Curated annotation (Swiss-Prot):
<dbReference type="GO" id="GO:0035550">
    <property type="term" value="C:urease complex"/>
</dbReference>
<dbReference type="GO" id="GO:0043419">
    <property type="term" value="P:urea catabolic process"/>
</dbReference>
<comment type="similarity">
    <text>Belongs to the urease beta subunit family.</text>
</comment>
<dbReference type="InterPro" id="IPR036461">
    <property type="entry name" value="Urease_betasu_sf"/>
</dbReference>
<dbReference type="Pfam" id="PF00699">
    <property type="entry name" value="Urease_beta"/>
</dbReference>
<dbReference type="GO" id="GO:0009039">
    <property type="term" value="F:urease activity"/>
</dbReference>
<comment type="subunit">
    <text>Heterotrimer of UreA (gamma), UreB (beta) and UreC (alpha) subunits. Three heterotrimers associate to form the active enzyme.</text>
</comment>
<dbReference type="InterPro" id="IPR002019">
    <property type="entry name" value="Urease_beta-like"/>
</dbReference>
<comment type="pathway">
    <text>Nitrogen metabolism; urea degradation; CO(2) and NH(3) from urea (urease route): step 1/1.</text>
</comment>
<keyword id="KW-0963">Cytoplasm</keyword>
<keyword id="KW-0378">Hydrolase</keyword>
<dbReference type="InterPro" id="IPR050069">
    <property type="entry name" value="Urease_subunit"/>
</dbReference>
<protein>
    <recommendedName>
        <fullName>Urease subunit beta</fullName>
        <ecNumber>3.5.1.5</ecNumber>
    </recommendedName>
</protein>
Length: 101
């Protein structure tokens, strides 16, 4: 082993196993691209993204940590979301919640 080397276990790793999911259709109605990170509270994303916000309160994208999804102007795509974990308190972002979910 070398310093800093990571030796991963063999086999497949299933991300967010057992988490309930919600799949929604999202449209970018703006004139600029919008990028949403893996742990961003999806309910509070850019107002130019059109979708049922009430349906996704307390949820984030079901993608690997540190990655993001980009929505080009005029683009519509399906995304899958999972619940935020931990204490289920949201602070910051666009300040739409600022407390427990």
């Amino acid at each position: 082993m070398k310093p800093g080397e990571i030796i991963a276990a063999s086999g497949e790793i299933e991300l967010n196993a057992g988490q309930p999911t919600v799949t929604i259709e999202v449209s970018n109605t703006g004139d600029r691209p919008v990028q949403v990170g893996s742990h961003y509270h999806f309910f509070e994303t850019n107002a130019g993204l059109s979708f049922d916000r009430d349906k996704v309160r307390g949820m984030r994208l079901d993608i690997p940590a540190g990655t993001a999804v980009r929505f080009e102007p005029g683009q519509t795509r399906e995304v899958t979301l999972i619940p935020l974990a931990g204490k289920r308190e949201v602070y910051g972002f666009r300040q739409k919640v600022m407390g427990p979910l």
